[in-house]
Amino acid sequence: MNTGHGTGQQIHPIVRVPFSAGVPLIEATFAARSGQFLVEAQMGGRMVRAHVADRGRLVDLLVPGARLLLAPREEVGRKTAFQVVAVYQDSDLVSLDTQLPNRLVAAALSLRALPQFARYGTVQREVQLGPHRIDFRLSEGLDTCLLEVKSVTRVIDGVAVFPDAPTERGSQHLELLTNAARNGQRAAVVFIIQRSQGVAFAPDETIDRAFSRALRTARALGVEIYAYLCPVTPTGITLGHEVPVFMSLSAVPSELRRRL
């Protein structure tokens, strides 16, 4: 289970951030996926093409008839006039804005709303470490912490899971954090669950066995692993409460799933 502090309904400053698009969103209906990053959608009686930034397979979310929230985009050189920022799964709004988790964590760190990292006064973003970049480097004097953020959108039987597609980059980030922890450096990963439903977090070994292995190794060697359930509305995302972390779906107690 989680190697960090306790889980549950923590009291912290309210942290909300808007969608990256920064414009009013338009509702549309998903019709088909025409490429890894392209979708066709019905909007106001016409078909439109929209870009989706999330690299996951999204097979549970992007189903015919699903309600989408699109942001109009007019940047020069764009091939699509719209960006998919969220999708409804039943009544649960799920963010597909890949920039939102890092922006949420950055805001939470600035407000010291994450108790695990509240002692750090300096926050550096996108820190280069060899060939890779780590999302945050936190410091207070000589005390430092490397922090990586991952976006979670998929839920299986009430458990939020990651990844939604094989991620060699994700495994490399975990290996980097593991090496840092092995050398005495504090290191952590925070999984931001971009939806309001989910009672726990676990890696999905059926999608990426290597990532699941790397996560177990990271935890065993001192990398701290946290997961936060972060409700999404049409205006943005809010930092919610921490949920317990397990190293496999089968390890999640059935009584915990029944709380959903």
Swiss-Prot record:
Molecular function per GO: DNA binding
Cystine pairings recorded for this chain: none
Top-rank lineage group of the source organism: Bacteria
Family: Belongs to the SfsA family.
PANTHER family for the chain: SUGAR FERMENTATION STIMULATION PROTEIN A
Protein name per its UniProtKB record: Sugar fermentation stimulation protein homolog
Organism this protein belongs to: Chloroflexus aggregans (strain MD-66 / DSM 9485)
Gene: sfsA
